[in-house]
Regions:
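Primarily NTPase-proximal linker/entry elements flanking Walker-type ATP/GTP-binding cores
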Residues: 1-95, 102-122, 130-138, 143-147
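Short glycine-rich anion-binding loops that position phosphate/pyrophosphate groups of nucleotides
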Residues: 150-152
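Conserved catalytic-core segment of NTP-binding enzymes
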Residues: 105, 125-140, 154-254
Length: 254
């Protein structure tokens, strides 16, 4: 990615007669902005609400991936809240049957948001929980199924097979990877690992309010060709905002 930006910068300077330092700074800044905009535009996100509403068949199934600690549970709750505000009903599948208290955390949010939740036994089959949630959505005419999954800190072969099985059985319309923007290179490694072993369609970045620049967005767009569709900017339910490339570029150069 840095090679592309430097090449663009070099091309923008070739043949230019510049007399003042201010002019050089402006040319460099404009070139950098243009390069970043091109990277983001090629992998622009999409409007999930429109995507769901345009799909004729119910339910729209979304599976969430992410290691422990990235804010996956809270992100699912925020997305459920956002969908509800847009007149879209949802049901949550607590398919993390591995981590202690995972289902209780989702149950807390589901109760506060007045959204149905399907739970399973700890140590039980995550795919079965997800399957039950989809069937429940069909019988109750619910628009969207939000499927939580296990995410151990050190992703292993057993977890990969478990997640693959969830995907195989649920046939999701969308696979979202949740990443912590503060994790830097670790987040990028997680993104590569999930892409190489399971696959996903889009990213939600959390804790962006605490991240100075959010450079991982560029790496995701350029290296992995994955769009960031939402940003988590706080702990409240309404602290989930669509990713805006213009806002991101301004933030980099402020």
């Amino acid at each position: 990615m840095s090679e592309k930006i430097l090449e663009d910068l070099k091309n923008s300077l070739v043949g230019k007669k510049v007399s003042r330092t201010e002019e050089i700074e402006k040319i460099i800044t404009d070139s950098l902005k243009k390069s970043i905009e091109e990277i983001l535009t090629k992998n622009r996100g999409f409007d999930l609400v429109k995507e769901i509403k345009s799909k004729g068949k119910k339910p729209y199934v979304i599976v969430f991936f992410g290691v422990n600690g990235v804010g996956k549970t809270t992100t699912i709750a925020k997305l459920a809240y956002m969908l509800k505000k847009n007149g879209i009903s949802s049901i949550i599948a607590a398919s993390d049957t591995f981590r202690a208290a995972a289902q209780e955390q989702l149950a807390y949010h589901a109760q506060k948001l007045e959204i149905p939740l399907v739970r399973g036994k700890y140590g039980g089959d995550p795919a079965a929980v997800a399957y039950d949630a989809i069937n429940s959505a069909k019988s109750r005419n619910i628009d969207v199924v939000l499927i939580d999954t296990a995410g151990r800190m050190h992703v292993d072969a057993d977890l990969v097979e478990e997640l693959k099985r969830v995907v195989r059985i649920t046939k999701p319309d969308l696979r979202i990877l949740v990443l912590d923007s503060l994790a830097g290179n670790d987040a990028l490694e997680q993104a590569r690992y999930f892409e190489n072993n399971i696959g996903y369609d889009a990213v939600i970045l959390t804790k962006v309010d605490a991240d100075a620049k959010g450079g991982i967005v560029l790496s995701l767009a350029y290296d992995l060709k994955k769009p960031v569709i939402y940003l988590g900017i706080g702990q409240e339910y309404d602290n989930l905002v669509p990713f805006d490339p213009d806002w991101f570029i301004k933030r980099i150069f402020q």
